[in-house]
Structures are given as C-alpha cells and as structure tokens.
Amino acid sequence: MQDRGSFRDPGNRVFAAPDAVYRGLSAEAADEWRALAASALADDPRIVATEEVAHAPEPWAALLRHERIPFVSYPYEWPFTLLKRAALLQLDLLLDALDEGLILKDATPYNVQWDGARGVFIDVGSFERYRDGTAWEGYRQFCQLQLYPLLLAAWKDVPFQPWLRGSLDGIAPAELRNLLSFRDRFRRGATTHVFLHARLERRYADRTREVKAELKRAGFRKELVVANARKLRGLVAGLEWRGASVAWGDYTQTWSYDENDAARKAGFVRDAVERVAPRLVWDLGCNDGTYSKLAAARGAYVVATDADHHVVDRLAREENERILPLVVDLADPPPPLGWRGAERKDLAARGTPDLTLALALVHHLAITRNLPLPELLDWLAGLDSALVVEFVDPADEMAQRLLAAKRAGLHADYDRSVFERLLGERFGVERTEELAAGRRVLYLVRPR
C-alpha cells in the first residue's frame, strides 16, 4: 500500500507492508541509488538498512526494501534536543556525501526518524550524484524546517512545535526576520542565514532557474557547498535551549509519593509489563520517564509523551535506546496534516500500543482541561490495548489544588465511583491497588 505522504517525487515512491517498507524507483532514481550503494555510505548505520529486491514489479526499474522504524514521529512532536540531533545528522551526511561525489537534494527533518535515541536517515532517494556548478538545493528547506525552529527556541525561548505543525514548509526567512530584534542581528549566523536570506529570497523569488544558470556560469564550486555546510554545522552545534519549565516540570519534586507508595506504584507497573509482555508501550504524561524506563528495561519500546517540553527534552538527553520522547498535548494532539489530511498521520494511525500507561494523568485532563471522563475513557479504550491507569481522588492534595481553580460544582462527576463505573463499562479490570490511604488508585485493565 502506497504511503499517502509519498507522492511529491514521481520517480521515488514508498509502500508500506507488514514486514517492511518498500521503495519503487524510476530508471533515473535507480542509477542514483546504485551510486550511493557503491559508495562508502552504503552500510552506514546512520542510514536506514536497505537492500535491493531482485525483481522489481512494473513500472519500477528497481525496488528497495527498508528496515522498519519502531514508531514514526514528526518534527513538530520532537523536543529541541531531537531536532538539533536531526539537523546535525543531515549536515554530517551531506558533508560525507560530498566526499563521495554525492549530495543530498533535500533537507527536510521528515527524512529522519528515531530508533530510541538513534537518528536514522530514511530517504535514500534524497542522495544523488553531485554535478559541478550546482549549489545545495536543500539549503532553504534546511533553514525553514531545522535551523529557524532551533533559532526560535534558542534565541527567543519560543516553542517551535506549533510553527512546524502550522506549516509543513516551516518558517519562512521573512517570518523569522520579523521576529528578531535589532540586537539579534549581531548573533552568529543571523546576518547570513536570516536577514540576507530574506532579502535575496524577495529579490530572486521568481528567478530560480536563472540563478541556477548564473551560478553554473560563474564556476560555482563544491568547496563552497562544503564551507557553507561546515559553518551551518558549527552554528547548530552551538545552539542551546534553556527554556523555563512549565508548571509540572518538577513534578517528582513537587508531588513526590512517600517511599513506600513510590515503590508500590513502581511494582504495580513492573508487574503489568510482565503480565502483558508488550512490544510497544505508550507512556502518556510520562514526565521524567520513570515508568517509561521500567518498561524499556523489560524489553518494550516506549513512546513517552508529555505536554511539558522541558521534561521531554530532559528525557531525550538521557539517550535511552528504547525510549522515544515526544512533546504531545493529549488535549490538543497532532492531527492528520498535509495534502488531503494524509501526508502526516495522527498518533493512533501510526501504530497502536500493546500497553498504555496513564499515570497521574486523568485528573489533569478531566479537571484542568475540562475533558469529559466518558470521552477520555472512550479514547483510551479506542487504543485497544491493555491499560494501567491511575485515579486521583478529589480529596487528594493534587486534585484539590486543581479543583480550587475551578468553579464550584463544575466537576461534580469527578468521583471514584463514577470513574470505576465508566472504566468497567469499557474494560475488564484485572487488578487494582490503593495508594496514599485510598486517595490514589491504580488499575490494570484490558479492553472488552
């Protein structure tokens, strides 16, 4: 089945199968692939493992088989650390490709996926032989989708995820220029990659082909591409985001369980993982990743999500090979995006979990975000996975602080008996355990 996000390059189409991902190549694209396969990059672990299938079906000149990635994610879900790593990965591959007489024609972060902390470049069709006199055509794309979002976070402490979700083309040079102050002009890279870029784009917007011809006539050299890529790499490598944590960023310090309850909660999760033996776990509202790490230590691959960019970034820096940390607000989750709403999929369409963890989550969504309990449990049931869910009683201090900010009576249905009735209508309850003198309850349930 053709991937509905693979249509922009007619000579290079991707098809998904249960066991692998396949790529059909035109005759021209097949020649470029074989140039890559004959280079020193052929078995590079940074590039998705690929082999050519013996017999390509019509109309393709060649058919490639790619190793599957555990879970597909998108740049508008990544924390700063992952986007920075993806940018550095692409620049390193660009430089290494140039050494081999190749170049990357694209520079979109969507060409990078994650196997835990390890970045994997998945678009082998982006490699082509370098032609003398040509510039790096991916430069603008790199700026809009990788450099500018990183600058926005590092220089202005503005989250880039909504920008990338709002436009699959990223942030235009003129848009970023208008967000920068006079003082920002003097930052490293600002003049060349933002202000000059915006000016030149305005001047040559309708003359792309003419500019390419002029560069070739002027004797544009590969060394200039290399020099620009190296400078970009130095700029990206030096960027750091020091954004302040949102309200729940220090959850473990602010709302810590006593030692006994913490051990019992960890034991409950550990037991659930052993009972279910999941391959894929979703840890919703993962915070510092305590329970993600428990599941990963028992062989599961964990997609750990939280709305707090700060804690997700902190988890990404730990570089756990079995945990993919994503910035996801479950009350405003990433929708299907792009052409016909099919280029980028929502979370559940990318592969549902075998086990879902929803710990210290329900009260936030029900009280803070005003999500109706029946609908929240309907959504969890729709994942069709085993579920570990925690209910925090209205009498608990955690819930009391949230309820204090709400109109009296607004959440009258937020009650343990109501929750258990709704839960029992959708799931079979396998095990429960009370913590904090009954003010917090853990449930292991399976879909009916």
Each model region followed by its residue ranges:
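Catalytic activation segment of kinase domains across protein kinase-like and atypical kinase folds
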Residues: 103, 108-154
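Conserved class I S-adenosyl-L-methionine
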Residues: 277-287
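Conserved SAM-binding loop of SAM-dependent methyltransferases across substrates and taxa
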Residues: 288-300
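Conserved SAM-binding motif I beta-strand of class I
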Residues: 301-306
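S-adenosyl-L-methionine
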Residues: 316-350
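A conserved beta-strand element that flanks and buttresses the S-adenosyl-L-methionine
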Residues: 357
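A short, conserved alpha-helix within the catalytic core of class I
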Residues: 364-380
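Conserved beta-strand signature within the Rossmann-like core of class I S-adenosyl-L-methionine
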Residues: 379-394
